[in-house]
């Protein structure tokens, strides 16, 4: 019986929340205000696997679904750090097996976000945000992390 119910479930296309909102719902406006400067965190997975933005190593016009969605939020200022899609160093087991390298990559990424003057680092990948939040806490930096869904939903 369970086999019958599960038949065809593998064919269901799974989408990341920003991909779904951007490509399927396609909002033209949001009744949300967030009067803050945010620095956009483009995760490796989001850029290179999910296509949430165009990777800098390809010679194509720049597009970014997260930036598009945040552009619908009133009063927000969106900036991006230098080397906007360089890895933050988390990468799952990489952070465990190469913790010193992972930590330095994360510090470098966080400092590039800090250099933008943003109050928040905003992204769609919880693991990247968690990694950077740990660095922010250890270094005592004056910047916070937020998942983009918190802003888009107005639940900040």
Predicted regions and their residues:
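A short, acidic, amphipathic alpha-helical segment used as a generic capping/interface helix at domain edges
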Residues: 101-117
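Short, flexible loop segments at boundaries between secondary-structure elements
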Residues: 11-29, 83, 137-156
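A mid-sequence, solvent-exposed acidic-amphipathic segment
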Residues: 60-95
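Single conserved hydrophobic/aromatic residue that forms the stacking wall/gate
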Residues: 2-13
């Amino acid at each position: 019986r369970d086999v019958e119910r599960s038949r065809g479930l593998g064919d269901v296309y799974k989408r990341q929340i920003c991909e779904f909102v951007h490509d399927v719902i396609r909002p033209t406006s949001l009744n949300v205000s967030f009067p803050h400067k945010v620095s956009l965190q483009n995760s490796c997975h989001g850029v290179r696997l999910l296509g949430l933005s165009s990777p800098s190593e390809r010679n194509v016009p720049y597009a970014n679904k997260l930036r598009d969605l945040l552009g619908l939020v009133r009063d927000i200022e969106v900036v991006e750090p230098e080397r906007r899609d360089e890895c933050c160093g988390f990468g799952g087991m990489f952070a465990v097996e190469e913790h010193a390298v992972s930590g330095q990559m994360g510090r470098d990424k966080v400092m590039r976000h800090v250099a933008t003057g943003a109050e928040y680092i905003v992204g769609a990948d919880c693991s990247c945000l968690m990694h950077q939040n740990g660095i922010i806490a250890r270094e005592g930096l004056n910047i916070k992390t937020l998942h983009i869904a918190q802003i888009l939903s107005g639940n900040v």
